[in-house]
Every structure is written in structure tokens, then in C-alpha cells.
């Protein structure tokens, strides 16, 4: 569906929230040792982000997903405190997530790249988000927006407005497979999220398991 631009995609290690700088540093190191070259944290503290950057070194892209914890004022304060750690993006820093005008102001005032969209359910919401200038990276979730057709509408909307698509995909089953195939059809594919945890088994065996931080898109 949509054709296949490539069958090799870049993945990133998406860590849980640990709220422990030493544990964050350890998980970052083990992710890098396993071949991932991009790391996402789920932290809301400066100490944890600092520990991740120290563990990763200066050249590894690091993102921080905060899951909508802050007011606009708090988000600006934290964005400035996190700026020295050179984040690729700051994800969902403001509650409520549909406060696109505040996200746009934060993005403009802080100069920090903003990612959002996992809580948006239609192309109409993404249109408003992008129109407001709220995001550098748009993050539709194929399981939340209603499937492949709506995802493709959002993809086209993002491309038309110069916004990079970075799908939200912390899944293990059909949603993850759909994300892989949709991303493979993108002219400018984003990175694909891999929840970094020990699995008893993978639903599809080794077919979707990243090797050295990359996926081979299954047929």
C-alpha cells in the first residue's frame, strides 16, 4: 500500500521512565552496545537527561518524551534547562496535548524542536496542529487515527507543509507491522520506535526485530 521506497529503516531505542540518573545512563549504554544509534527517554528531570547525554556522548541523537506534564510556563522553563543537552526533540511537553497555540509559542520562544501527535485522532487535528506551527515532528499513531487511510492523509499533509513525519509506534502486534510498512512507503521516512525491554517472545519471531538499530521490512 503506497509502494515501497525502501526496505531498510532506522530504529531508535525507546526507554521507560526510570527517574534514576544511574539507571538511565546504564540503559543508554546497553542500547548503544546493542547497536542503536538514537535514544528516546521518558524523563521529566534534568539530572536524568544530563546522565543520558554523558553516557551517550555528544554525537548520539537523544529525544525526550515527557507525556504532557507541564503548563506552558513550566514547559518553557524546562525546555531552557534541557537545551544544553542538545535534544533532537522535546515531545509532548504541555497539557492538554491539543493546546497547539502554546506548543507553537514554546517552539518559537525556546528554539527547541517539538514533537507531538500521538493524542491526535484525525487528519483535521493534525491540520490545526501544523497550521499553528506547533510541531517540528508530527507523530501520528496508526492505531489511534483510524488506520492506514487516515495515516496517509496525515503523511501528505505533513509533507506539504515541510513537517517531518515520526510515527508513534510503541507497539508489539499489527500496529507495529503497519507502522513499518507505512514508514517504508514514505519518501522521507522517519525513525521507528522500539520499546527497549526484555521480551519473553516476539509475536512475529525475528521478522521485525531490529539488528544494529535497523529494521528489515518484512514481506
Regions found by a protein language model. Give the residues of each.
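N-terminal capping/lid subdomain adjacent to the active-site entrance of alpha/beta enzymes
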Residues: 1-63, 67-76, 80-84, 204-219
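Flexible C-terminal active-site loop/helix
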Residues: 149, 154, 170-219
Amino acid at each position: 500500500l503506497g509502494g515501497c521506497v525502501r526496505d531498510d529503516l532506522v530504529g531508535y531505542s525507546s526507554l521507560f521512565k526510570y527517574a534514576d540518573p544511574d539507571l538511565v545512563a546504564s540503559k543508554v549504554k546497553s542500547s548503544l552496545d546493542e547497536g542503536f544509534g538514537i535514544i528516546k527517554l521518558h524523563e521529566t528531570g534534568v539530572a536524568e537527561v544530563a546522565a543520558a547525554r554523558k553516557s551517550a556522548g555528544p554525537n548520539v541523537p537523544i529525544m525526550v518524551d515527557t507525556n504532557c506534564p507541564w503548563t506552558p510556563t513550566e514547559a518553557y522553563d524546562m525546555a531552557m534547562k534541557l537545551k544544553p543537552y542538545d535534544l533532537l526533540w522535546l515531545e509532548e511537553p504541555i497539557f492538554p496535548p491539543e493546546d497547539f497555540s502554546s506548543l507553537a509559542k514554546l517552539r518559537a520562544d525556546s528554539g527547541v524542536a517539538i514533537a507531538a501527535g500521538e493524542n491526535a485522532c484525525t487528519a483535521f487535528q493534525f491540520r490545526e496542529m501544523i497550521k499553528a506551527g506547533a510541531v517540528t515532528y508530527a507523530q501520528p499513531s496508526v492505531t489511534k487515527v483510524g488506520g492506514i487511510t487516515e495515516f496517509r492523509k496525515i503523511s501528505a499533509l505533513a509533507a506539504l507543509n515541510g513537517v517531518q513525519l515520526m510515527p508513534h509506534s510503541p507497539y508489539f502486534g499489527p500496529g507495529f507491522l503497519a507502522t513499518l510498512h507505512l514508514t517504508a512507503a514514505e519518501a522521507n521516512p522517519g525513525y521507528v520506535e522500539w520499546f527497549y525491554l526484555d521480551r519473553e517472545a516476539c509475536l512475529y519471531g525475528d521478522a521485525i526485530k531490529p539488528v544494529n538499530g535497523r529494521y528489515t521490512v518484512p514481506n
